[in-house]
Amino acid sequence: MKQTFRFIKPIERITHLKPNATMMLFLASVLAVIMANSSLSTIYHEILEYPINLTIGGHEVFSHHGETMTLLQFVNDVLMVIFFLAVGLEIKQEILVGELSSFKKAMLPIVGAIGGMIVPVLFFLLVVHEGPGARGAAIPMSTDIAFALAALAVLGSRVPASLKVFLTALAVADDIGGIIVIALFYSSHINIGMLAIAFGILFIMYLMGRMHVSNLGLYFVCTFFVWLFFLQSGIHTTIAGVLAAFMIPARPGLHAKNLRAEMRSLFEAMPNDKIRQSGSSLILSHNQINVINSMRKIARKAISPMQLMEEYLSPIVGYFVLPLFAFANAGITLGGVTADALWGVPMAVFLGLFVGKPLGIYFFTYGFVKMRLCPWPEGMSRLNLMAVSLFGGIGFTVSLFIATLSYAGAEHLLFLNEAKLGIFVASIFAALVGIVTLRYELNLESAKAQKS
């Protein structure tokens, strides 16, 4: 009985977590599955087919191959650009000052990410190596960092910080690989003229950064036009979000070291005017308001446009874009999957994510360390490396996205449905086995510490 309670403790920890973006993403996915497999399925598909219109000067902005975008296309081709803009900002931060900022720091996560991209593809192709189903070989390449870190958080503060750092850096390197795959293999009929205009706008954004332009509105407007011309160029629009992110300056208008002195001088300049007060109501003088507004502007200058944009985008992506993406794309029709079909695309995706991804990350990382090409990360053992590698098999968001690109069109709907099933099952297995493995390792370490 005691063992049973010990086993369900992580589940209890999940149920006591306050609602967050990851939980909303999970709930949106569950809602999509319920609606797609109930009497609400007609309503669900009608929602996804709802047309999205925006006409400016006679030009229909949200147009997909000359036709008005449906809600599903709008989510995948427009809203996901915002997600990849946020991903690009995160990648840029890691390259500038994070775990990818030096060759020595970046080497091991990059090697692990490479293994975690190559081996899953091989496992997929072992099962489905020809025909239209093989188009989805890239599906098990990706890690969902939000769900992976949420699974890690289930075990609380006992998890070594080095594991979180390694998993985050691994996922960022993984994102870079996924972006390259999307750019190379999911673009068609490239319009060089439109692409040249898009890169011209990106160059203007670069010059704006060099000229210390910090107005986020201008960068958002430029990003919109970069997206618009990428949409017409034939290269997938998510690449526009990533490239635009790299153009956002990371240099603030005021160095943090000078912020305290600036604030002190403004604080000392605060007029000692009489404050009118009645109960909890309080009215400042105009001079006091001016000084406080100056403080606000100075404080804002101390934050770079890159970090400001990330702060703005984070809640939008977490609480709106990703849950809506999950709702639009996670609707698996379980009734349409036969027993024979399970051995095709679903098994290929499952083996790629749950077996290939962890093995690729683990053996590439461990092999690199054994060859003395890179030091073993502090606080990491072989067993918790395997646990982190299993968390890498939680694909979900980006895997679903690549599945929609791989099996686009009505003729591939069955493959898309099967791929979604494989992603769901593999991600759940990877999370559960990863949690159990890491919990076992942490308990072993705790027992050893108590004996000593």
Curated annotation (Swiss-Prot):
It is a multi-pass membrane protein. GO terms for cellular component: plasma membrane. GO terms for biological process: regulation of pH. It comes from the Bacteria. The keyword Chaperone does not apply. Its main location: membrane. It catalyses: Na(+)(in) + 2 H(+)(out) = Na(+)(out) + 2 H(+)(in). The chain crosses the membrane at residues 23-43, 71-91, 108-128, 136-156, 165-185, 189-209, 216-236, 316-336, 349-369, 385-405, 418-438. It is found in: Cell inner membrane. The keyword Cell membrane applies. InterPro entries: Na/H_antiporter_dom_sf, NhaA. Keywords: Antiport, Cell inner membrane, Cell membrane, Ion transport, Membrane, Sodium, Sodium transport, Transmembrane, Transmembrane helix, Transport. GO terms for molecular function: sodium:proton antiporter activity. PANTHER family: NA(+)_H(+) ANTIPORTER NHAA (PTHR30341:SF0), SODIUM ION/PROTON ANTIPORTER NHAA-RELATED (PTHR30341). Belongs to the NhaA Na(+)/H(+) (TC 2.A.33) antiporter family. Na(+)/H(+) antiporter that extrudes sodium in exchange for external protons. This is Na(+)/H(+) antiporter NhaA. It comes from Porphyromonas gingivalis (strain ATCC BAA-308 / W83). The gene is nhaA.
